[in-house]
């Protein structure tokens, strides 16, 4: 297999050198030879295996490709992930944090069953069947974390992040949230919704330090990154 030249752009996140001008990113495989969503596996010049991170299947991946400047998830980070779905993005987050826990909350039992297939090989993914709007449900499982990542398609997306931060996020920790405008209101201008959600985050205790629109990968979506200042 041809060895690929990689450049580390964030801790444990790599960009592939390509001739076509397209930005491609990858994470080092925590579980070699194991695909999660049909992603391509490559070998780096260090003879280690890497997984291509498809931005069409991951809002965090899309934000990185679109120029995210602040990426607080790194090796050793303790992460609370709200809305893990079938586990595409959490699997890459688990690659990044290596042995540190990724507390993985999902509300739908059917989807959680799919996620269990992902987590069985990645021991740092801790599956939690729970409701992100009610953090007390999993307060006996989740410890204080460095980062909360939220991808929950509900009207009160920003409030969910603030409430979970009050329970679990350390002082000076980071919140990352993918805002889906159409989940808040299908009729209003997405830009108005983004600004409204941003203000809720600020009033709740976050200092917004980065924001990235993730089109064309996801329509009417933005990703905010904020530093938590406990009230």
Swiss-Prot record:
Keywords: Methyltransferase, RNA-binding, rRNA processing, Transferase, tRNA processing. Its EC number is 2.1.1.-. Transmembrane segments: none annotated. Pfam families: Fibrillarin. GO terms for biological process: box C/D sno(s)RNA 3'-end processing; tRNA processing. Belongs to the methyltransferase superfamily. Fibrillarin family. This is Fibrillarin-like rRNA/tRNA 2'-O-methyltransferase. It comes from Methanococcus aeolicus (strain ATCC BAA-1280 / DSM 17508 / OCM 812 / Nankai-3).
